[in-house]
From Swiss-Prot:
Keyword Transferase applies: yes
Protein name: Methionyl-tRNA formyltransferase
Gene source species: Streptococcus agalactiae serotype V (strain ATCC BAA-611 / 2603 V/R)
TM stretches of this protein: none
NCBIfam families (alphabetical): fmt
Entry keyword Transferase: yes
Taxonomic classification: Bacteria, Bacillati, Bacillota, Bacilli, Lactobacillales
One annotated Gene Ontology cellular component of this protein: cytosol
Length: 311
């Protein structure tokens, strides 16, 4: 039985780990995941999804803040693993660890060489891609630059957002990994180098990138909101306060970008660079998320045609 170290953090990773454990061909010696974090308004300490799966299966868990140079790194290197599998781990693996095992592969949620980095699904949706996917790749010291072992693609529809794509790609990645590993370990599957001329990057989303640019097209803003949902969530300003947009649809109309151009009891339409969007689900500053009807009948009741978002 092949002995593995598994490294990952979110639900995407947990789905992959569950698949490995259910497959029965691999012995997961240990799991490495990010430290427990305080989440939500109450700042409650929460385990990562991968840690939860590991504990349910009595697998030792390591949670270094930074793996490189940590005592945990030295401990991991003494376990005698044959290889490493990572999926959305969130840290670079030290070269000495990579060199201590027979193989190290990563389940990356993009069709490499496009979208190397930590937010490939976000950028695929924001940029209006028609498909996303998963690449199984060998790990090297350079980020997401290793040779590609296998790929699988998935259509992106207008109904998709980061959450739906994460869920679908986790299952695709799990199945692709389990289909690929036997042939890779036997040498029947030969990894292929990435074409460096086709490389693009998807770094972690910065706070500035969450902000809506109302001068952009309706399609771009629609994609932007979907590409930020359910996290980190797109936002704009309303009367100088942060105003989050969870769901919008493309609409028609003309006006100055960011300007309210239509309002009823149940709908609110805002002008964009080439048309308009209709707001569906929002969160005003200091309030919970709400649908647009509740907003317009509550804190947004004084909003008028001609008022501007983004200011």
């Amino acid at each position: 039985m092949t002995k593995l170290l598994f490294m990952g953090t979110p639900d995407f990773s947990a789905t992959v780990l569950k698949g490995i454990l259910a497959d029965g061909k691999y012995d997961v010696l240990a799991v490495v995941t990010q430290p427990d974090r305080a989440v939500g308004r109450k700042k409650e300490i929460k385990m990562t999804p991968v840690k939860e799966v590991a504990l349910e299966n009595n697998i030792p868990v390591y949670q270094p803040e930074k793996l490189s140079g940590s005592p945990e790194l030295e401990q991991l290197m003494t376990l005698g693993a044959d290889g490493i599998v990572t999926a959305a781990f969130g840290q670079f693996l030290p070269t000495k660890l990579l060199e201590s095992v027979g193989f190290a592969i990563n389940v990356h949620a993009s069709l490499l060489p496009k979208y190397r980095g930590g937010a490939p699904i976000h950028y695929a949706i924001i940029n209006g891609e028609k498909e996303a996917g998963v690449t199984i790749m060998e790990m090297v010291a350079k980020m997401d630059a290793g040779d590609m072992v296998s790929k699988a693609s998935v259509e992106i529809t207008d109904e998709d957002n980061v959450g739906t794509m994460f869920d679908r790609l986790a299952v695709v990645g799990r199945d692709l990994l389990l289909d690929t590993l036997p042939g890779y370990l036997s040498g029947d599957i030969k990894p292929i180098p990435q074409n460096e001329e086709e490389v693009s990057f998807s770094p972690n989303i910065s706070p500035d990138e969450e902000r809506i640019d109302w001068n952009k097209s309706s399609r771009d803003i629609f994609n932007h909101v979907r590409g930020m949902y359910p996290w980190p969530v797109a936002h704009t300003l309303l009367e100088g306060n942060r105003f989050k947009l969870y769901e919008v649809t493309m609409s028609e109309g003309k006006g100055s970008p960011g300007q309210v151009i239509a309002k009823t009891k149940n709908s609110l339409t805002v002008a964009t660079g080439d048309g308009a969007i209709e707001l569906k689900s929002v969160q005003p500053a200091g309030k919970p998320r709400m649908d647009i009807k509740d907003f317009l009948n509550g804190v947004g009741r004084n909003l008028e045609i001609g008022d501007k978002f983004g200011e």
